[in-house]
Amino acid sequence: MALHLRSSFSSKSTLLNILRHNLGFGSRSHVTRHIRQILPHDPPLRGSQNPISRLCNTMAEPETLSSFVQHEYANNHQVMDFPGGKVAFTPEIQFISESDKERVPCYRVLDDNGQLITNSQFVQVSEEVAVKIYSDMVTLQIMDNIFYEAQRQGRLSFYATAIGEEAINIASAAALTPQDVIFPQYREPGVLLWRGFTLQEFANQCFGNKSDYGKGRQMPVHYGSNKLNYFTVSATIATQLPNAVGAAYSLKMDKKDACAVTYFGDGGTSEGDFHAALNIAAVMEAPVLFICRNNGWAISTPTSDQFRSDGVVVKGRAYGIRSIRVDGNDALAMYSAVHTAREMAIREQRPILIEALTYRVGHHSTSDDSTRYRSAGEIEWWNKARNPLSRFRTWIESNGWWSDKTESDLRSRIKKEMLEALRVAEKTEKPNLQNMFSDVYDVPPSNLREQELLVRQTINSHPQDYPSDVPL
C-alpha cells in the first residue's frame, strides 16, 4: 500500500482526499459517513461538531494519521476466500439491480428491407450455401402450408408449422456440421431438411405409415433420424436440454471436433430442465449450444407473463454462460452467430446461449386458434415487415445469385414433389399392430404379451371402434 501523506494537513478537505485515496471510498461523503461510525460516541467538544474536525483534533501528528489509514485500509481490503474465487467486502448495503438500465442489444446484419447494414460483422457465405439456405427456407414454408391444409382436410391427425421462424431453422443448421448432434423441439424440421431428410421421409412420419422410422408410434412433426444425428422430438417441453448437455460432455470426453445443439422456445425457459441444463453445462464446461427461439408466445402465454428479466439472454450470464441475442428473422445474422458460437464452444470447451428474437406467425398448432389471444393485424405486420424469406431473398438477389424465374421454378418443383410425397405416404400401409409392443425388450415379458393379446381381443370384439387400415 502506498500512503500519500503530507507532513501535516491544514484543512478538512486535505484529510478527506487522503482518506478517500488510500481507503478506496467512492466519494468524500462515503468517507464522512464511515468516520461517523468509527469515532467514539462521547459528546464532541464545542466547535467541533463536524466529524472531520473531530478527527483532525485527534491526529496532530502524521504518524497518527498513517497508523489510522493503515488500520482502516486493512479493514476495507479484506476479502473472503470462497469456493469459486475471492469475494470483496463492502461497508454499504448494496443490492444488485434486477435489470440493467438498457436492454441487451440484438445482433443483426440485414435491415428489415434486406439491405446490408453498414460496418456489420458477419461470416462470409458462399453463393452455394446462400442459395441452399434460401431454397430450404422456401421448401420448409411450402411443406408447412401443404401439411397444415392436409390436417384441416382430416388427412393428418396433427401438425405444427415453423412459419415465420424459417431463418432460425435453416441458417443455424447451415452453420453446423453433420457431426454435431441435434436435440430439437417440435419446431425445427428445417434443421433436418438441411441435413438431407427428404420430403417423402417427412410425409411418412406425419402419416405414421410402415416406412416411418418411428413405426407410427409418434405424433406428426415429432421427427427423428439416427443417420442424421437428429434425436427424436419429445413432446414434453425442455426435456431435450439436459440430454444435450450429456451428449456434449460425451463429445468432450471423446475429444471430438463437434458439439451438441439443442433448440427450445421461450416457454421452455419456464421449465426446471432449462435451469438444470444451463447450470450443469457451465459447471462441466460442456460444448453445447442452447438456441432459444423467443417467438413471443408460449402457446397463448406472452413473454410478459412468463418472466420479468430482459428476455432469455440474461439468464445465461446468471449461470456463467457466454450469451448473445440475435435477430432470428435475419438469416445472415443467425448463420454468423451460430457459426461463431460453434467454433467458440469447441475451441474453448464451453456452453453458449443464443437467444433468437422472432415471431410465431402460425398458430401454435392445429389444435390452436391464436386469433383468440392476439390480433390478426399483429400477425400480418410481422409476416410482412420482418419476413425472413423476403429479407434474405433481397440480399441474394443483390449479389446476382437469384431471380424471379429461379424463384418460380423452385416453388413449382417443390409443390409438385410435396404433393406426390403426400399421395405416396397416405397410400402406404400402416405398421403392424405388433409394433406397439416391440423394440423395448429383446424378449418381451409375459405381462407385455398379455397386453398385446388383450388389445387384439378388444379390437376383434369392437372392430367399429378402431382403424380398419392397421394390420393385425
Curated annotation (Swiss-Prot):
Name of the protein in its database record: 2-oxoisovalerate dehydrogenase subunit alpha 2, mitochondrial
Superkingdom of the source species: Eukaryota
Top class in the EC scheme: oxidoreductase
GO terms under biological process: branched-chain amino acid catabolic process
Keyword Lyase: no
Family recorded in the similarity comment: Belongs to the BCKDHA family.
EC number annotated for this UniProt entry: 1.2.4.4
Cofactor: thiamine diphosphate
Residues the entry annotates as binding K(+): S234, T239, Q240
MF annotations from Gene Ontology: 3-methyl-2-oxobutanoate dehydrogenase (2-methylpropanoyl-transferring) activity; metal ion binding
Subunit structure, as described in the record: Heterotetramer of alpha and beta chains.
Binding site for thiamine diphosphate: Q185, Y186, R187
Cystines in this chain: none
UniProt-listed PANTHER family: 2-OXOISOVALERATE DEHYDROGENASE SUBUNIT ALPHA 2, MITOCHONDRIAL (PTHR43380:SF11), 2-OXOISOVALERATE DEHYDROGENASE SUBUNIT ALPHA, MITOCHONDRIAL (PTHR43380)
Keywords: Metal-binding, Mitochondrion, Oxidoreductase, Potassium, Thiamine pyrophosphate, Transit peptide
InterPro entries assigned to the protein according to its UniProt record, in alphabetical order: Alpha-ketoacid_DH_E1_comp, DH_E1, THDP-binding
Function: The branched-chain alpha-keto dehydrogenase complex catalyzes the overall conversion of alpha-keto acids to acyl-CoA and CO(2). It contains multiple copies of three enzymatic components: branched-chain alpha-keto acid decarboxylase (E1), lipoamide acyltransferase (E2) and lipoamide dehydrogenase (E3).
Stored Gene3D superfamilies: 3.40.50.970
GO terms under cellular component: mitochondrial matrix; mitochondrion
Miscellaneous comment in the UniProt entry for this protein: Bound potassium ions stabilize the protein structure.
Localization, UniProt: Mitochondrion matrix
Substrates-to-products reaction catalysed: N(6)-[(R)-lipoyl]-L-lysyl-[protein] + 3-methyl-2-oxobutanoate + H(+) = N(6)-[(R)-S(8)-2-methylpropanoyldihydrolipoyl]-L-lysyl-[protein] + CO2
